[in-house]
């Protein structure tokens, strides 16, 4: 680590801290004006963003990156439209800052309010998803936080082009341009500086990327972290499930987009309906281009599958691969999920209410779904506008991290001259 990088990052932290103060008291109208102007700027810069993305994609191809990686990196007309729409959706959300979460009166006449406040400065470290630049910048802005963005070198051109549009939004609303900053160096030493907190400037770190990145952040960070290590998501088909529904959900949960953290990685089927449900579901997946890795029982019923290893049950493929096992009803599903899950997202297809109740009560994951695809594990789908990530820990934020999760709170106590005496 060079002294120059430490100095550069210290200056980034200083600017962010300075910008956080006026941003914390910005009006909802100011923040929304900045967000809508940023969305306009992204659409106006569409050609520049696509050209920048082509440079990143060319480098990815040159470096032989996996198809799932390239998918996460790729921008097109529709995805740019979606980025702009996501920013506008965030602008329509209620302003969390200043919201009174709870209030009560004490016998001595004191009136107490618990009120949402910004966290301060958020550091976001991510890899190949250029859309995170927009999502993180917009969410932090709406919640009154300054943000320092450190994208991976693989998406550097795309992220820089999107970042320029975000700054235009800030300037249009007369908000500090330094409220959203992108780390100006690609050296990994910059990440190390962020994990130290930049001399107290950073209040929380949000990593969004692969297992090695998140593990490093959790290991080295000297500030709080909102993180998930991986998305080992399960889909359980119960004996009470409607087969047509199960087929639709299984195909979507795995194959809609295989490279996202909400994609199903393991399919569990109730042994009681294996003879009727397994082959149609796996046939759909195989026809869609998915590789099936099954337990010995699955292979006996579906010989086209490949043998699953012990490692498969704890692997996040992020690819067109799924591991499949038969289980003894809801009890077997709960046991398997609690053993192998990363506590991200699990789904059940079932019509029996008691079975669904057990699934919801006995599985400790951030997101649980009934009769719906795991791919709904997304802040946008939850009505949050977008998300900065999905947290699987239990402290402060859990599940999609949207504007509310990017706030803290303080107490306002109103009296009329009371003393304790």
Swiss-Prot record:
UniProt protein name: Gamma-glutamyl phosphate reductase
SUPFAM superfamilies, per the entry: ALDH-like (SSF53720)
Gene Ontology MF terms: glutamate-5-semialdehyde dehydrogenase activity; NADP binding
Pathway: Amino-acid biosynthesis; L-proline biosynthesis; L-glutamate 5-semialdehyde from L-glutamate: step 2/2
GO biological process, one term: L-proline biosynthetic process
Family indicated by similarity: Belongs to the gamma-glutamyl phosphate reductase family.
Cross-referenced InterPro entries: Ald_DH/histidinol_DH, Ald_DH_C, Ald_DH_N, Aldehyde_DH_dom, G-glutamylP_reductase_CS, Glu-5-SA_DH, GPR_dom
Gene3D superfamilies in the cross-refs: Aldehyde Dehydrogenase, Chain A, domain 1 (3.40.605.10), Aldehyde Dehydrogenase, Chain A, domain 2 (3.40.309.10)
Gene Ontology terms: cellular component: cytoplasm
Gene source species: Brucella melitensis biotype 1 (strain ATCC 23456 / CCUG 17765 / NCTC 10094 / 16M)
Presence of the UniProt keyword NADP in the record: yes
Enzyme class (EC, first level): oxidoreductase
Enzyme Commission (EC) number: 1.2.1.41
Classification via NCBIfam families: PRK00197.1 (NF001221), proA (TIGR00407)
Places the protein is found: Cytoplasm
Keywords of this entry: Amino-acid biosynthesis, Cytoplasm, NADP, Oxidoreductase, Proline biosynthesis
Catalyzed chemical reaction(s): L-glutamate 5-semialdehyde + phosphate + NADP(+) = L-glutamyl 5-phosphate + NADPH + H(+)
Lineage: Bacteria, Pseudomonadati, Pseudomonadota, Alphaproteobacteria, Hyphomicrobiales
Protein function: Catalyzes the NADPH-dependent reduction of L-glutamate 5-phosphate into L-glutamate 5-semialdehyde and phosphate. The product spontaneously undergoes cyclization to form 1-pyrroline-5-carboxylate.
């Amino acid at each position: 680590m060079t002294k120059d990088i430490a100095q550069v990052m210290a200056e980034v932290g200083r600017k962010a801290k300075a910008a956080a103060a006026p941003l914390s008291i910005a009006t909802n109208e100011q923040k929304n004006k900045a967000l809508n102007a940023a969305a306009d700027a992204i659409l106006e810069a569409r050609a520049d963003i696509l050209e920048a993305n082509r440079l990143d994609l060319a480098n990815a191809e040159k470096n032989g990156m996996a198809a799932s990686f390239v998918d996460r990196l790729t921008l097109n007309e529709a995805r740019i439209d979606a980025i702009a729409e996501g920013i506008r959706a965030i602008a329509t959300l209620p302003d969390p800052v200043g919201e009174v979460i709870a209030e009560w009166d004490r016998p001595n006449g004191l009136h107490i309010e618990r009120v949402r406040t910004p966290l301060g400065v958020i550091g976001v470290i991510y890899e190949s998803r250029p859309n995170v630049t927009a999502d993180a910048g917009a969410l932090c802005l709406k919640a009154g936080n300054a943000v320092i963005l450190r994208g991976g070198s693989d998406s550097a051109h795309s992220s820089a082009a999107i970042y320029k549009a975000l700054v235009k939004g800030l300037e249009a609303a007369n908000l500090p341009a330094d409220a959203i900053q992108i780390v100006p160096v690609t050296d990994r030493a910059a990440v190390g500086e962020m994990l130290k907190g930049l001399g107290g400037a950073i209040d929380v770190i949000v990593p969004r990327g692969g297992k090695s990145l998140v593990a490093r952040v959790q290991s080295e960070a000297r500030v709080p972290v909102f993180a998930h290590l991986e998305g080992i998501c399960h889909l359980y088909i119960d004996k009470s499930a409607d087969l047509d529904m199960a087929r639709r959900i299984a195909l979507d949960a795995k194959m809609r987009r295989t490279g996202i953290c909400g994609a199903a990685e393991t399919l569990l089927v109730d042994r009681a309906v294996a003879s009727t449900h397994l082959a149609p579901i796996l046939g759909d997946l195989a026809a869609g281009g998915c590789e099936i890795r099954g337990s010995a029982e699955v292979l006996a019923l579906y010989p086209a599958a490949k043998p699953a290893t012990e490692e498969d049950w704890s692997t996040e493929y992020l690819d067109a691969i799924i591991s499949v096992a038969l289980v003894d009803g809801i009890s077997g599903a709960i046991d398997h999920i609690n053993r192998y899950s990363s506590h991200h997202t699990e789904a059940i297809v079932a019509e029996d209410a008691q079975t669904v109740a057990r699934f919801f009560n006995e599985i400790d994951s951030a997101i649980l779904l009934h009769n719906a695809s795991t791919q709904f594990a997304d802040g946008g789908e939850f009505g949050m506008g977008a998300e900065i990530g999905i947290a699987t820990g239990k402290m402060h934020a859990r599940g999609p991290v949207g504007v509310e999760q990017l706030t803290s709170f303080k107490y306002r106590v109103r009296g009329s001259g009371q003393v304790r005496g």
